[in-house]
Amino acid sequence: MAGRKSSRTAERVPTTQKPERKSAILSPHDELRERLLETAIDMKENIPQRNTRNSSVGSQKSDCSETRKRRSTKEGPAAKRHSGEKHRNGSREDSLEYISEYSDDREVGSSSSQSSRTRGQPLPAMPEEEEVFDKSSSSDNLAESEESHEMVRLEERQDIEEEIEDDFDDEEEDVVNDKEEYEEIESEDEDDYPVQNEGFAVTKRLMNDEHMVTAPTFLSTAKCDGIGSPTKVWSLMVKRDEIPRATRFLLGNHPDMDDEKRRILIDWMMEVCESEKLHRETFHLAVDYVDRYLESSNVECSTDNFQLVGTAALFIAAKYEEIYPPKCIDFAHLTDSAFTCDNIRTMEVLIVKYIGWSLGPITSIQWLSTYLQLLGTGKKNKSDHYEEQNMYVPELLRSEYLEMCKILDFLLFEIDSFTFSYRTIAAAVLFVNYEPTCAVEKATGFMQAQLEKVIEYVEPVCRAFAKQRQLLDDVIPKHESIKSDDSHNIQVYVKRSSMEPIVKSERERIQHLKARRLHPQRLF
């Protein structure tokens, strides 16, 4: 930073203009040395001569220098400054040292000038060319620093990109390794560790079978809207029905049980479902649980605990099917407090264990509901086109549905019904009670000739209930707490004792007609 020039200094400065100097940083070594020497000479010539007044003032200041030094030591080290005598009497070497100090410590010099100015010492007058030197050098340094910063940024960016690429490669390797490990584990599980639950193994084999079953003609895409393709939906339902149900030898492990005791148990379960206003599906699920438990259980079921089996089965089915199932304490009260809640829960664990946790079979009630929904015809719109209805909406009269449901309820009492699947029993009941036959075939997917044996078995029961209906003129039961559009789904009690003689007489009559080669008439 150049000091202010006095009038005397201006007189002694030569008027000749020196050529403009370039940046010393970019000059060769010899040129730099010569120019530094010239600068030192110029500075020496520009130092002002002191008069007597200035010398007296300087002596007074020198006398006080020791005092100021003492004060300055308290405040910190004094800033560096070059005395006037050193500039006046110094040699060329001293000037070179000063210039080297000034060129190396430019930043320190600016702070030193501020401190020296406050202490009253005059600053050496710097030529204007030095300012040009500083500006050019600072601009060059700035350019170099910017270039170096850019280089550093580029290097950092390259490093980051390399790290990202390495991480991506590592992730790909991890994914490949995980996939290989998963395949190895899966192959080990399939080969060395078979499914422990045999029921699940059968279900897995059937459900994963690629063979597709042709869907009935009435099962269109519109009726399966939101479910899936008709072929796939029907195939899954049929495969689910192929899971074996209980057989007629289900009481082989229970010597104290017989067919009559089983009928008594099912009769009581039906009465409980009616009193608690449970749905028909709940009753059919509970009976299925009881039958499969009796066939697979090694725990002997006797007259002392067979009611407990039915109670626990109802408790499980209600939790599976009902929105608001009764509590365990409610079922305990229905047994006249013969069993506690702990007894029911213990038996519940045993039932789900022995039936293999397979709690959702497609019962005959579900198949019948599906067939009737497929038989429903579409409604005409204003343009005289038929609109296909969703398969969830039943179209047949509820009274006919109730009559066929009672037939399926009664068939649960008979051991011989285990010979046939739920799907075929529901289709046979529909063949006997509904016309035309071609429509039933399109809804069930069966030809009538395929179900000849099943139809022969269910026909006497269907005719017995048709006679009973004409005598009693049954109506749909009404419940105050149940909505009218759901009342036909509530289980009703079928008087087994009054229906068994009628069914027996009908079977004898049909056998007599067949012996005479006569065919019975249609019911409806």
From Swiss-Prot:
Keywords: Cell cycle, Cell division, Cyclin, Cytoplasm, Cytoskeleton, Meiosis, Mitosis, Nucleus. Residues 1-155 are annotated as: Disordered. Disruption phenotype: Loss of cell division in vulval lineages as a result of lengthened intervals between cell divisons. RNAi-mediated knockdown results in arrest prior to the 100-cell embryonic stage. Depending on the knockdown, some animals reach adult age. In the 1-cell embryo, persistent ruffling throughout the embryo cortex and mislocalization of par-2, which remains cytoplasmic, and par-6, which is distributed throughout the cortex. In 50 percent of embryos, the first division is symmetric. Adult mutants are sterile due to a lack of sperm and egg production. Gene3D superfamilies: Cyclin-like (1.10.472.10). GO terms for cellular component: centriole; chromatin; cyclin E1-CDK2 complex; cyclin-dependent protein kinase holoenzyme complex; cytoplasm; microtubule organizing center; nucleus. Residues 48-62 have a biased composition (Polar residues). The keyword 4Fe-4S does not apply. It is found in: Nucleus; Cytoplasm, Cytoskeleton, Microtubule organizing center, Centrosome, Centriole. Its main location: nucleus. SUPFAM superfamilies: Cyclin-like (SSF47954). The keyword Transport does not apply. GO terms for molecular function: cyclin-dependent protein serine/threonine kinase regulator activity. Pfam families: Cyclin_N (PF00134). InterPro entries: Cyclin, Cyclin-like_dom, Cyclin-like_sf, Cyclin_N, Cyclins_cyclin-box. Belongs to the cyclin family. Cyclin E subfamily. PANTHER family: CYCLINS (PTHR10177). This is G1/S-specific cyclin-E.
